[in-house]
Amino acid sequence: MSLEEIANYIVSDGKGILAADESNPTCGKRFDSIEVENSENNRRDYREMLFRSKGMKGNIGGVILFDETLRQDAKDGTPLKELISNSGALPGIKVDKGLVPLVDGSDEVVTQGLDGLDERCSEYDSLGAKFTKWRAVIKIGDSMPSDDCINANAKALADYAAIAQSNNMVPIVEPEVLMDGDHSIDLSFDACARSFQALFDALENNGVNIKGTILKPSMVTPGSLSEKVAIREVAEMTVRCLKENIPSDLPGVAFLSGGQTELEATAHLNEMNKIGGFPWKLSFSYGRALQQSALKAWSGKSENIFIAQDELSHRAEMNKIAALGQWDIKLEDR
């Protein structure tokens, strides 16, 4: 498959992305909430449960993995990446190395991981990964985000994207504007717009093939400590921000859920697709908003596997329907 074919496939027909690339420490936090030990075997069992869910088929086009998972085998010896492929989804890999302060003492951060990235990508390509992901973090606060922060992260994302494409893998570029804080939806709109402008300028300057790239942005929402606004307002502001700042030849936008509840993430996505009138697919790349109910239902017990899989399958199906603009809250009744 070409880069363009891979990117288009991942978001085709309402399909989206299951973000299962939690680092081991983050996985530990999730497991703490259900009182399960954060062991290699438990991480494998949990992800095997997800990837064997019936609802993967037809609803999930790609799965983002952590390094460990790309190399792991299921209990019966089948590579986990093969379970993903068998469901009709493509395996992908998180390649960044986390956040460091932009400058000493700064509250702002930049993502590291460019050192040795070409070699890592070459290996991931040989292991069967079809796409990659790199997350940048933009904070809103006093004098934040600064131009320096936005530009440094845009450059790192563009450098990463060029390296991923040179190794035959689609880059997912993720400029996450954090919800943390009491900022207004207008400040969120401004931070997203500036991040998009800088990112696509940097991608173009680096010769990145936009048709073989996927954007994983935040939705335009008020800060988590601010009053919530109507679903329609989030949808309208987000669509406007994208239309004003994103090139039309980008194949897909796969939103992060960023601390939204499962239902909020689905409702917002649906409302945007009901608005319509944009050249790219608007889809999902959700972690917690796909996994939360499944994780709770599983709780580390093998006898709960089928109930947990039903939860994941349901959320995957609901989000596919939302990516087609056809979701309704009544569909949540089971």
List the model feature ranges, each with a label.
Residues 1-127, 140, 228-237, 243-244, ...:
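Alpha/beta catalytic barrel-like cores
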Residues 145-153, 183-196, 226-228, 258-266:
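Active-site glycine- and acidic-residue-rich loops that bind
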Residues 179, 183-249:
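Catalytic core of soluble alpha/beta enzymes
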Residues 39, 134, 173, 215, ...:
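Conserved, mostly hydrophobic/aromatic
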Residues 86-95, 124-136, 164-175, 210-212:
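Short coil-to-beta-strand
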Residues 45, 106-120, 145-160, 194:
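Glycine-rich anion/phosphate-binding loops
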Residues 98-102, 137-143, 178-182, 222:
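Conserved radical SAM core fold
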Residues 117-131, 153-169, 195-206, 235-244, ...:
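Structured alpha-helical segments in the cores of large, soluble enzyme domains
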